[in-house]
């Protein structure tokens, strides 16, 4: 089974709070409705556009998504 984006994102949780990636990871961790098992870009981006108040910019997600695909 492929690792979910959420599992990938958690590796960034403990870092400098000024980093938007760290804030995204911490926000997703605190978001109990985040689609934790998803590996689908459309599902994740749609969810974040509607519910990701903790995400500074969708660019942060898009860049992490590219890294996730590269490392998967």
Swiss-Prot record:
InterPro entries named among the record's database cross-references: UPF0346, YozE_SAM-like, YozE_SAM-like_sf
Annotated Gene3D superfamilies: YozE SAM-like
SUPFAM superfamilies in alphabetical order: YozE-like
Family membership noted in the UniProt record: Belongs to the UPF0346 family.
Protein name: UPF0346 protein GK1571
